[in-house]
A protein has these predicted regions:
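Acidic, glycine/proline-rich Ca2+-coordinating loop motifs
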Residues: 1-288
Length: 288
């Protein structure tokens, strides 16, 4: 198995072409030295034990984002496995299986605006209506950063100091100032972009500067990604769309990276299992 230019992320197996053997999905996680640009994932067809690149599904998986988790599941109830992807700084993607050819139906299901730093994904019929629901894990609601559709987190990225490497600036609208402001201090920004020390001679000069003012004269407009949700979320399958329901408050106290769905207590209902906690090495994401 080859042809992957990114670091390898999630793996998933299913007989998606209906020939009786298990085929392989290889998720693209991160492009080395190019985070957070979207990676490309791949499907490999199982041909009598030899895996060959599925060229028919190349386009639908090109630059689908930084895939952190994946699961095959019959989301549309037509009898074949569809592909569900959790992406970082992106949506939970659903790729519908149409006789071995996949179609990205994320937008038509109303999921394209539900962007997060999604870590894990699993499926199961959580409300007993016969339809496969999705559970996606995120960073929870107990950390230093919060996000909402009206006040999203934004990640600006580009070669701002023109040294051939990507620079990153995390930003959010300051509720008091009503302006889009960086979420890192001047010292951290100046370490990554030394030219700022020439532009801002004092902390006072920098303190009230918006993202537009800081990055406005760095050349080409920066690329930007947005996160509108950080909650661990149940996506209820309503047939033609999904309804987002946050998991209970106790589940939101820490990030979660793996999620499993099964009847753990034997009562006939599907339950949700989360693995949680995060030990950070870089501020502001302390241990939680």
């Amino acid at each position: 198995v080859g042809g992957i230019s990114s670091t390898v992320g999630a793996l998933a197996l299913a007989d998606y072409d209906g020939d009786g053997d298990l085929d392989l999905f290889v998720g693209g996680r991160i492009l080395p030295a190019l985070y957070p640009r979207p990676a490309t994932s791949r499907l490999f067809v199982n041909d009598a034990g030899a895996f060959t690149l599925d060229s028919e599904n190349l386009d639908v998986l090109a630059e689908r984002g930084m895939v952190s988790a994946a699961v095959f599941s019959d989301v549309d109830g037509d009898g074949d496995p569809d592909l569900v992807l959790a992406t970082e700084w992106g949506p939970v993607r659903v790729l519908r299986n149409d006789r071995g050819r996949f179609v990205d139906v994320t937008a038509s299901l109303g999921l394209d605006g539900l962007t997060g730093r999604w870590n894990g994904v699993a499926t199961g019929d959580l409300n007993g209506d016969g339809l496969m629901d999705i559970v996606a894990t995120n960073w929870g609601q107990n950390g230093p950063l919060l996000a909402s559709p009206t006040r999203p987190l934004r990640l600006y990225h580009g070669d701002f100091d023109r040294n051939g490497r990507l620079d990153l600036v995390l930003a959010q609208v300051d509720e008091q100032l009503g302006r889009l402001m960086p979420l890192v201090d001047f010292r951290q920004l100046a370490q990554a972009m030394p030219f700022l020390r020439l532009r801002y001679r004092t902390a006072e000069n920098f303190a009230g500067s918006s993202i537009a003012e800081i990055l406005g004269s760095t050349g080409a407009p920066p690329a930007v990604l947005e996160v509108t949700h950080l909650e661990h979320t149940l996506l209820l399958n309503r047939g033609s769309s999904f309804e987002a329901v946050p998991l209970p408050t106790t589940a939101q106290l820490a990030p979660s990276f793996f999620v499993g769905v099964a009847d753990f207590d034997g009562d006939g209902n599907e339950d949700v299992f989360l693995t949680q906690n995060f030990l950070a090495t870089v501020s502001p994401a302390d241990q939680y």
